[in-house]
A protein has these predicted regions:
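Bacterial Sec-dependent N-terminal signal peptides
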Residues: 1-25
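Extracellular beta-sheet/turn segments enriched in Thr/Pro/Gly and aliphatic residues
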Residues: 85-106, 201
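Short, acidic Ser/Thr/Gly-rich low-complexity loop/linker segments typical of extracellular
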Residues: 46-56
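Short, ordered, surface-exposed loop/turn motifs in non-cytosolic proteins
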Residues: 22, 30-44
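Aromatic- and Gly/Pro-enriched, solvent-exposed loop/edge beta-strand patches characteristic
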Residues: 166-239
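A short, solvent-exposed loop/turn motif at the edges and junctions
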Residues: 42, 70-81
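Beta-sheet-rich sandwich/jelly-roll-like modules and their strand-loop junctions
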Residues: 97-174, 221, 225-284
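A short, amphipathic beta-strand motif
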Residues: 22-29, 55-57, 90, 102
């Protein structure tokens, strides 16, 4: 009898969890093609995930079904829907862009110069499970760049604990030292293999001129199943008690360097840009 009761409890719990999750898909309203790596955010519960390469994602039912779901994808209008009205297949409307602050044109200059460096000891930063954010570094303009107008490539140092993992890069113009207009209107998705690696991403095809106001390079973690990672760890609670537990995050980790000032580093969280942990990219 005891065995039957235990088995019933397991089946009931499993069934409840299954019904609390739904699979959704995001499609381009015009082409009907999947929209990959869109950010999906439940406002009241601080839950942020991404659609995968096929535009699909699994979303847990929020405590309040009247909560709003925000969908933000590069190249598309932001969509805000009540969870109770959220269809399993959602279409996103492409938007047109007017870039007032950044010039984009054909590149003819073949000379190169590096800006930014890697120095000292680095430390790895994970994304966490529920508090995904963007981490951006500001590169101010210098007169030394007058003869080197176009941004050719970006180099990022990452540490990856799984076989392969993906992340996105975003490029923003600057206004009063803060991130402003998003320059790239398509995903710059990068795949890295296991280990600590320097990865150089060629963006010369975007033909982006270095703005006089400077530019921000932002790193975006992707909350997709293929990036999911767990490991055993000792966890300390608020009372100083230690216990064995499981740490969850999304790979890869971004390697950063601490600096005396964080004025050039910004963190995008809950739809707001704020000064954050200092990090080093290398732009060349």
């Amino acid at each position: 009898m005891k065995m039957k009761i235990k088995l019933l409890a397991i089946l009931i719990l499993f069934q409840v969890n299954v019904f609390a999750q739904k699979t959704y898909k995001l499609l381009d309203e015009v082409t009907k093609k999947p929209v990959a790596f869109a950010s999906v955010y439940i406002e009241d519960e601080n839950i942020n995930i991404n659609s995968d390469e096929k535009g699909a994602f699994i979303l847990n039912s929020p405590k309040n079904v009247e909560s709003f779901v925000m969908i933000n994808a590069l190249g598309y209008e932001v969509k805000k829907i009540k969870y109770s009205d959220f269809a399993t297949e959602t279409h996103l409307k492409p938007k047109s862009f007017i870039l007032d602050e950044v010039k984009v044109s054909n590149s003819k200059n073949t000379r190169q110069i590096n800006i930014g460096t890697f120095k000292g000891n680095d430390s790895a930063h994970s994304s966490g499970m529920r508090s995904l954010f963007l981490l951006a570094r500001y590169f101010p303009y210098s007169n030394d760049y007058d003869n080197y107008q176009f941004i050719k490539s970006i180099t990022v140092l990452t540490k990856n604990e799984i076989k392969t993992a993906k992340f996105n890069l975003r490029i923003y113009s600057a206004l009063d030292g803060k991130p402003s207009t998003l320059i790239n209107q398509k995903n710059i998705t990068v795949e890295v293999k296991k280990g600590k690696k320097l990865t150089t991403i060629d963006i010369s095809d975007l033909n982006i001129i270095m703005p006089i106001e400077g530019v921000f390079i932002a790193y975006e973690w992707l909350a997709i199943p293929s990036n999911y990672h767990t490991n055993k760890a000792t966890i300390t609670d608020n009372y100083g008690n230690k216990k064995n537990g499981i740490m969850e995050d999304y790979q890869p980790m971004l390697c950063t360097i601490y600096e005396a000032s964080n004025k050039n580093t910004w963190r995008y969280f809950n739809s707001v840009w704020r000064n954050g942990t200092s990090n080093h990219f290398n732009n060349k």
